[in-house]
């Protein structure tokens, strides 16, 4: 086992971080009702369309810039100074303080946290400026759901409304010149034409959406997860007992949000988990999730049977005081459900699920996560940590999909959701897994019913098991479908799934696949404004605005690199063809010529029937072109 260095190379860390804005893009901010609500977007500048009208110089027609949702934080803003050793500025600090329902603690509450703090050997691993943890005042509930149910619109809710409403804000100005969006099918979702702060509040109050914003993670930019909002994507990072370092994990965090991760889960299972998580949280503008049972297991040297409620409780408090925004807790794995997995092809594949199943069998007792669930809720609402109720019995192969064990646990998760909501604690529900395409929709339908429309958060699902090395592709297919049916957040899968710990490039590949899947789901639902991005790409493609195509691509770097592999010269970026078809066979160039012919020969475009050019005029055009061909020497290529 590789030992982690007991130091952090801050120079190496700073040099790893990618800070450059995307090509042709700038970070802009839209202000809300108060100066400290500044919502970031990526604005893509587009070049003019050249309109040819005869022999003279072409007329320029401006293309307005396109604004895109941006979760990359200040890392893509060259105007914002960043000091990784100090972390990001506390964006939400003033909002938390002005509510006057939290208090700074005199010190760290968890025994393990104090032990780490007092170990001089770890001094060089710790951040130099760790913030003082906060907790709700006695008797207070500081969850966003609690505020929402009291009718309070928080700054976080307004921030989210501006963020989610962006595409709608651009819609009116573009509809005059763009194709109308294709009609979507939302499967009875309640997606409004305009997102308001009141709509955000109402969705959170109903439990149909969550705002994962721990009071001890003031650096985070508010975001929302719910099926009536844009589909979100989560990326998993974290060290293992075999490999990785703090520098690597912080770099993977920043790399993940650059490529579109809306939340990040730290699934570290190696050394110095506490310190690694602190560096990640302090430098993260997106919500951070964890699976606390992983660290609790490390505290008992990997022996599941030695876990206790006291150790788990201390771990929850430790992580909540660091600022973790949501916990995956496998409280639905009950003793009675474990035998239901006996005849499965792949048994229990969830790490957290298998840990709790082993504990239940070792003690022949009900899980302490289930029996102590009310006590867990008390901790969650004191810090505003959101539940991500884990699917510990999810299928690990399509042979096991939608079986009795999976759905038994799902109904228990619905029961636990109701308990959490009595405490005004936010909840989302985790889902599979491995599910063949024809069974995907059943998962969403059953989850919406069993869990009262709490947001669904799924790992894929993979729709086939034959794709090791390409699981990001097979799972993105399932993700696009399950997102369309109503899943609120998709957990990415990388090419290394089932094979090894993902590296930097694997993280990017997984995220690109899943951002495409999420966008496809938004399009299919008919999410207002989602098609604007597609229209902008298509218009640039038809007009051979190559630079704009690269800028608008979900991965500009790769789009440009692929183009330049065969046509590297700068003049190729204004050419009306690419290396796929060449100058003679480009369908879009030919289509432009047909359009120009129709413009110059209006008499030749009289319609004999709707959408059909009169046959005589077509024949005339053919004869003219045939004559040109013969006079040109009858050569196919000149």
From Swiss-Prot:
GO terms for cellular component: cytosol. One of its GO terms (biological process) is thiamine biosynthetic process. [4Fe-4S] cluster binds at residues 578, 581, 586. It comes from Polaromonas sp. (strain JS666 / ATCC BAA-500). GO terms for molecular function: 4 iron, 4 sulfur cluster binding; carbon-carbon lyase activity; zinc ion binding. It catalyses: 5-amino-1-(5-phospho-beta-D-ribosyl)imidazole + S-adenosyl-L-methionine = 4-amino-2-methyl-5-(phosphooxymethyl)pyrimidine + CO + 5'-deoxyadenosine + formate + L-methionine + 3 H(+). The keyword 4Fe-4S applies. Pathway: Cofactor biosynthesis; thiamine diphosphate biosynthesis. Zn(2+) binds at residues 434, 498. This is Phosphomethylpyrimidine synthase. Transmembrane segments: none annotated. Keywords: 4Fe-4S, Iron, Iron-sulfur, Lyase, Metal-binding, S-adenosyl-L-methionine, Thiamine biosynthesis, Zinc. It is an enzyme of class 4 (lyase). Substrate binds at residues 236, 265, 294, 330, 350-352, 391-394, 430, 457. Its EC number is 4.1.99.17. It comes from the Bacteria. Binds 1 [4Fe-4S] cluster per subunit. The cluster is coordinated with 3 cysteines and an exchangeable S-adenosyl-L-methionine. Its cofactor is [4Fe-4S] cluster. Homodimer. Belongs to the ThiC family. It holds the Pfam family ThiC_Rad_SAM. Catalyzes the synthesis of the hydroxymethylpyrimidine phosphate (HMP-P) moiety of thiamine from aminoimidazole ribotide (AIR) in a radical S-adenosyl-L-methionine (SAM)-dependent reaction.
């Amino acid at each position: 086992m590789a030992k982690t260095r007991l130091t952090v190379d801050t120079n190496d860390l700073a040099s790893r971080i990618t800070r450059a804005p995307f090509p042709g893009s700038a970070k802009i901010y839209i202000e809300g009702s108060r100066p400290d609500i500044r919502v970031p977007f990526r604005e893509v500048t587009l070049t003019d369309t050249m309109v040819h009208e005869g022999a003279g110089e072409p007329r320029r027609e401006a293309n307005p810039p396109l604004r895109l949702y941006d979760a990359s934080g200040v890392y893509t803003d060259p105007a914002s100074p960043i000091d990784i050793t100090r972390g990001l500025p506390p964006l939400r600090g003033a909002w938390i303080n002005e509510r006057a329902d939290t208090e700074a603690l005199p010190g760290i509450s968890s025994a393990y946290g104090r032990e780490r703090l007092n170990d001089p050997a770890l001094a060089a691993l710790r951040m130099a400026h760790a913030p003082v943890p906060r907790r709700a005042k006695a008797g207070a509930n500081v969850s966003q759901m609690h505020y929402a149910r009291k009718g309070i619109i928080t700054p976080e809710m307004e921030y989210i409304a501006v963020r989610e409403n962006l595409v709608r804000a651009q819609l009116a100005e573009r509809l005059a010149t763009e194709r109308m969006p294709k009609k979507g099918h939302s499967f009875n979702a309640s997606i409004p034409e305009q997102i308001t702060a009141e709509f955000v509040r109402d969705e959170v109050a109903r439990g149909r959406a969550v705002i994962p914003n721990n009071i001890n993670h003031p650096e985070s930019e508010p975001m929302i997860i719910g099926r009536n909002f844009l589909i979100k994507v989560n990326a998993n990072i974290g060290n293992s007992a075999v490999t990785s370092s703090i520098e690597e994990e912080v770099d993977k965090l920043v790399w993940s949000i650059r490529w579109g991760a809306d939340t990040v889960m730290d699934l570290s299972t190696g050394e110095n988990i506490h310190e690694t998580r602190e560096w990640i949280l302090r430098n993260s503008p997106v919500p951070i999730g964890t699976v606390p049972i992983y660290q609790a297991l490390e505290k008992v040297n990997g022996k599941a049977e030695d876990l206790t409620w006291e150790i788990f409780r201390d771990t929850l408090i430790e992580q909540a005081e660091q600022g973790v925004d949501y916990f995956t807790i496998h409280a639905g794995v009950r003793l009675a459900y474990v035998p239901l997995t006996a005849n499965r092809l792949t048994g229990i594949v969830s790490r957290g699920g298998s840990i709790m199943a082993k504990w239940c069998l070792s003690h022949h007792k009900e899980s302490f996560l289930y029996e102590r669930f009310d006590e867990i809720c008390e901790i969650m609402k004191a810090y505003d940590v959101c539940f991500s109720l884990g699917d510990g019995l999810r299928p690990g192969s399509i042979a096991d999909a939608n079986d009795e064990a999976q759905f038994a646990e799902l109904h228990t998760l619905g029961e636990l959701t109701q308990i959490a909501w009595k405490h005004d604690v936010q909840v989302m529900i985790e889902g599979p897994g491995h599910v063949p395409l024809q069974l995907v929709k059943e998962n969403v339908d059953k989850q919406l019913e069993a869990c009262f429309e709490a947001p669904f958060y799924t790992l894929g699902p993979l729709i086939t098991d034959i794709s090791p090395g390409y699981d990001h592709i097979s799972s993105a297919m399932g993700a696009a479908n399950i997102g369309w049916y109503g899943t609120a957040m998709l957990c990415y899968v990388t090419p290394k799934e089932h094979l090894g710990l993902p590296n930097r490039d694997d993280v990017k590949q997984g995220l690109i696949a899943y951002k495409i899947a999420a966008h496809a789901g938004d399009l299919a639902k008919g999410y207002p404004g989602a098609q604007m991005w597609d229209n902008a790409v298509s218009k640039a493609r038809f007009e051979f605005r190559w630079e704009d195509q690269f800028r608008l691509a979900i991965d500009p770097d790769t789009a440009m690199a692929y183009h330049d592999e065969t046509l590297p010269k700068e003049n190729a970026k204004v050419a009306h063809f690419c290396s796929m078809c060449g100058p003679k066979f480009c369908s879009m160039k030919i289509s432009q010529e047909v359009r120009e012919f129709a413009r110059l020969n209006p008499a030749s475009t009289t319609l004999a029937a709707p959408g059909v050019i009169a046959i005589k005029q077509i024949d005339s055009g053919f004869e003219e072109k045939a004559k040109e061909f013969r006079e040109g020497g009858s050569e196919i290529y000149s």
